[in-house]
Amino acid sequence: MNNLKNLFVYGTLKEGGHLHDVYLKDQTFMGVYYSEPDYFMHDHGPFPIVFPVKKGTGQIIQGEIYEVDSSKFGTVKTMEEGAGYDVMTDIFLSKGGMIHRVASIFAYPPQYFKVPLDFEIKKGVVSWAV
């Protein structure tokens, strides 16, 4: 029996993204959710990069949750780690203003988030268009 995991996706793995059908087409879509304001999303052209930032000082990331089996999660993990991402688990996601799910997200390690000292993160909800 495969263990199921909640995976929060915000870029090319979302419905309509060019990697969705490759990795998540056969997994269970659980809905659109929002992260806590603990991240910064950078539009890197063909895909977004998300960095964790100090709790409560970042942006709210809009994404989708998929319930994935452990084998598929491992396949996605290998792909994401190959691109430099780390898996972060137990992020809290809301729907309608209330915490509804805990999931894993792939984000770049915080040490790669290099910005000028006067850089200000634009607050609010951000979403990457596929």
Task: Spell out what each predicted region is.
Residues 2-130:
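Glycine-aromatic micro-motifs
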